[in-house]
């Protein structure tokens, strides 16, 4: 080592110079342990959720994303120039044009120099965008970021295969089904996977219907009590020759007839099936965004955080068992955070299907009264690229100071993401 020290400043031969740099790097890595920055949520905003071909159908995902990003930055009270990078989840991108997150970001008036990335982890996309942004902030690559998710299922196109047009016409495929809702490994719909879970976990049609009705009831009560007011940014829609229409409330939860729910036919499995249009989530439009930053940046910008990112994790299982995947991600998060199930004040388990929540409550042995307390995707709607971010947004507002909330969401292919926050 003394000989190497003596060479400092006088080494000209490339081999020795490279060796010296390697030794310096080794010295530094052994001498110091890197510390991660604390990441906080400064604002958390979402658009209302529109029904399929409903109130927001005229707005592409990128426009909804623009509204969410703009709303989150305004709520944070920081200059747009402070946002160093943007990640947004978006699943079915066909027909949206290049780089959807870039479109949403520039539409929100952020500087042209802002890097943008679109994340696709199917239904977990919005949550994964938050996790990836948190990692960048923790490591010090950036100090202020926006992350969230967006989807307009009303605007997803039909496609046809390229090539010569065959005799007899062409077959159009619905990209909602092909790219969003089909298990490519077993070549079955997500709903058939959910039916498999219902059978495996012994969860009846009646249990699922009861849960679905509870979701609708909780959503209505939450809206009536103003539980969503602080997280919504209204969407103004221009209508030719008519006054502008302002959408400021979720559309889906009002569209239910409780008396018809038990009478509906099953959708995916005709004989001995359990899943219906009522106890599954719907196709929807919406976007959500959060302003994330390091605790140091929050201090520098003199902003008060809503919550801190405490831990997060992904998990994966057999693709057909995707509804059960959250039950494997959640224990990882609790372990990383050093917490027990009993420490969690509020759980969000995305309601892709009612059976998903019922199965995960059963596997995790958690209190149903603490799960999706203000309803979920069955009643509010499930814009697939948005939902993972939406449940984090809601927790950031619904928790009380000092409480922990844990959100989890399954995704096609057998995956899940889970994220823990602490309200500040």
Curated annotation (Swiss-Prot):
Main subcellular location of this protein, as a coarse class: mitochondrion
Gene Ontology cellular-component terms listed: endoplasmic reticulum; mitochondrial inner membrane; mitochondrial matrix; mitochondrion
Residue numbers marked as site, Increases nucleophilicity of active site Cys: 382
One Pfam family hit: Thiolase_N
Family membership noted in the UniProt record: Belongs to the thiolase-like superfamily. Thiolase family.
N6-acetyllysine PTM positions: 63, 171, 178, 187, 199, 220, 227, 242, 248, 254, 260, 270, 335
Subunit composition and interactions: Homotetramer.
Coiled-coil spans in chain: none
N6-succinyllysine: residues bearing it: 63, 75, 171, 178, 187, 199, 220, 227, 240, 242, 260, 263, 265
Activity regulation info: Activated by potassium ions, but not sodium ions.
Post-translational modification: Succinylation at Lys-265, adjacent to a coenzyme A binding site. Desuccinylated by SIRT5.
Chain sites annotated for binding K(+): 216, 277-278, 280, 378
Active-site positions on this chain: 123 (acyl-thioester intermediate), 410 (proton donor/acceptor)
GO biological process: acetyl-CoA biosynthetic process; acetyl-CoA catabolic process; adipose tissue development; coenzyme A biosynthetic process; fatty acid beta-oxidation; isoleucine catabolic process; ketone body catabolic process; liver development
Descriptive protein name: Acetyl-CoA acetyltransferase, mitochondrial
Record field: catalytic activity: 2 acetyl-CoA = acetoacetyl-CoA + CoA; propanoyl-CoA + acetyl-CoA = 2-methyl-3-oxobutanoyl-CoA + CoA
Residue(s) carrying Phosphoserine: 204
Transit peptide (residue range): 1-30
Secreted recorded as keyword: no
InterPro entries membership: Thiolase, Thiolase-like, Thiolase_acyl_enz_int_AS, Thiolase_AS, Thiolase_C, Thiolase_CS, Thiolase_N
Reported function: This is one of the enzymes that catalyzes the last step of the mitochondrial beta-oxidation pathway, an aerobic process breaking down fatty acids into acetyl-CoA. Using free coenzyme A/CoA, catalyzes the thiolytic cleavage of medium- to long-chain 3-oxoacyl-CoAs into acetyl-CoA and a fatty acyl-CoA shortened by two carbon atoms. The activity of the enzyme is reversible and it can also catalyze the condensation of two acetyl-CoA molecules into acetoacetyl-CoA. Thereby, it plays a major role in ketone body metabolism.
């Amino acid at each position: 080592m003394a000989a190497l020290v003596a060479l400092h400043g006088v080494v000209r031969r490339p081999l020795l110079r490279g060796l010296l740099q390697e030794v310096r790097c080794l010295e530094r890595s052994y001498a110091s342990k890197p510390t991660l920055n604390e990441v906080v949520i400064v604002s958390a905003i979402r658009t209302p959720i529109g029904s399929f071909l409903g109130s927001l159908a005229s707005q592409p995902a990128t426009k909804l994303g623009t509204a969410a990003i703009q709303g989150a930055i305004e709520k944070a009270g920081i200059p747009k120039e402070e946002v160093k990078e943007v990640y947004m989840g978006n699943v079915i991108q066909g027909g949206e044009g290049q780089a959807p997150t870039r479109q949403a970001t520039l539409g929100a008036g952020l500087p042209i120099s802002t890097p943008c990335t679109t994340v696709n982890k199917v239904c977990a996309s919005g949550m994964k965008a938050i996790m990836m942004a948190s990692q960048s902030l923790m490591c010090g690559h950036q100090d202020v970021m926006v992350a969230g998710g967006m989807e307009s299922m009303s605007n997803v196109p039909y496609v046809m295969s390229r090539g010569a047009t065959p005799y007899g016409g062409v077959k159009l495929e619905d990209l909602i089904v092909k790219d969003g809702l089909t298990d490519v490994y077993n070549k079955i719909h997500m709903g058939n996977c959910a039916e498999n879970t219902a059978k495996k976990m012994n969860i009846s049609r009646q249990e699922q219907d009861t849960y679905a009705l509870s979701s609708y009831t909780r959503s209505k009560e939450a809206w009536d009590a103003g539980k969503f007011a602080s997280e919504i940014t209204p969407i103004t829609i221009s209508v030719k020759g008519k006054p502008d229409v302002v959408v400021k409330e979720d559309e889906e939860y009002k569209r239910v007839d409780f008396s018809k729910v038990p009478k509906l036919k099953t959708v995916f499995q005709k004989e001995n099936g359990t899943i219906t249009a009522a106890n599954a989530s719907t196709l929807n439009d919406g976007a959500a965004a959060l302003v994330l930053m390091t605790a140091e940046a929050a201090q520098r910008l003199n902003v008060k955080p809503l919550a801190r990112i405490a831990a997060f994790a992904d998990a994966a299982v057999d693709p057909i068992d995707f509804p059960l995947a959250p039950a494997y991600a959640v224990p990882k998060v609790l372990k990383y955070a050093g917490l027990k199930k009993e420490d969690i004040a509020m759980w969000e388990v995305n309601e892709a299907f009612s059976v998903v929540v019922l199965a995960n409550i059963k596997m995790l042995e958690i209190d149903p009264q603490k799960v999706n307390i203000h309803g979920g995707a069955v009643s509010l709607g499930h814009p697939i690229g948005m939902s993972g971010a939406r449940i984090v947004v809601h927790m950031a507002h619904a928790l009380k100071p000092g409480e922990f909330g844990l959100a989890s969401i399954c995704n096609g292919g057998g995956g899940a993401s889970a994220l823990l926050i602490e309200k500040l």
